[in-house]
Amino acid sequence: MRFFIADDDRAVRSILRQIIEDEDLGEAAGEADDGSQVEGHMLQFKQIDILLIDLLMPGRDGIETIRQIQNTYSGKIVMISQVEAKEMVGEAYSLGIEYFIHKPINRIEIVTVLQKVKERIELEHSIGAIQHSLSRLVNRTERKARPQQKSDSGLKEAGTFLLSELGMMGEGGAHDLMAVLQYLAEHEQSEPHEKQSPSLKQIFTQVAVRKLGTGASQTEVNREMKASEQRIRRAIIHSLHHFASLGTTDFSNPKFETYASKFFDFPVVSQKMKELQSKDAKPLAPARINMKKFIHVFFLEAKLLHETMKQRRI
């Protein structure tokens, strides 16, 4: 604990300094023989915890000094004086002093008062530390609860796994689907109350703009939209062929049972299976691909898988 003593009587300053040191109350870090030498910024710089100040001093008295420093000094103040006028004592307390000690100096009284002030400071420090810890905990909780602005790497991992399960890894449209997944995740975070999914046009437009940059012309964006849609369509057809092959070989295949009916209309899968079983290489009819359904299910399954992966890691 660091003390500063302001009193025009050298003997009083010496006695107070001796008591502080003998009783291990702290350190007498500075002295002044007049209130005009006491400034709030100086006390703060010296890290003074307790200011001991006389009321009556020739230049600037204790009352006026407290008024001058009360906005810049955050430590505790104990006033020492031979003045007994209730009005002046009351004014000192109204300015925020902790105690008023009457002269002549009584060692026991000084030690008792300074111990109480010291304990109050230590208690305030403890409470402040607890409040700081709680504040950090609350902030950490809020940060965890706050949605991430960037695409979650865990969702990307889930999407990559799904592409492998769907037989689409290595296909040109796989990268486009991952870009769509990222856009849908960020769109859901920014528009949490929007019930309807974005249209395919909106999805492909935003994905194209992100890829080309905002400086791209509308012609370039339209060209990229069409190319991206075609790549994804070819990748979906490849996945359809993949599941039809699995179903033809083993109708109870776990992957076939898990994904085929989720991502495709089953009549389309059944038609593709018949084509594979037919000796005629010519398709019975063009496969009808529901791209919006596929993309929507891909997003939902990736989110579900991501949540499952997180739970397993906890």
Swiss-Prot record:
Q: List every position bearing 4-aspartylphosphate.
A: 54
- One Gene Ontology term, aspect cellular component: cytoplasm
| Pfam families per the UniProt record, alphabetical | Response_reg (PF00072), YcbB (PF08664)
Q: How is it modified after translation?
A: Phosphorylated by GlnK.
Q: Identify the SMART domains for this entry.
A: REC
SUPFAM superfamilies on file: CheY-like
- Molecular-function GO terms, alphabetical: DNA binding
Cross-referenced InterPro entries:
CheY-like_superfamily (IPR011006), Sig_transdc_resp-reg_receiver (IPR001789), ST_Response_Regulator (IPR052048), YcbB (IPR013972)
UniProt keywords (A-Z) are: Cytoplasm, DNA-binding, Phosphoprotein, Transcription, Transcription regulation, Two-component regulatory system
Q: Which GO annotations describe the biological process of this protein?
A: phosphorelay signal transduction system
Which PANTHER family does the UniProt entry name for this protein? TRANSCRIPTIONAL REGULATORY PROTEIN GLNL, TWO-COMPONENT RESPONSE REGULATOR
The protein's job, in short, is:
Member of the two-component regulatory system GlnL/GlnK that positively regulates the expression of the glsA-glnT operon in response to glutamine. GlnL binds the promoter region of glsA-glnT in vitro.
- Quote the protein name from its UniProt record: Transcriptional regulatory protein GlnL
Top-level taxonomy? Bacteria, Bacillati, Bacillota, Bacilli, Bacillales
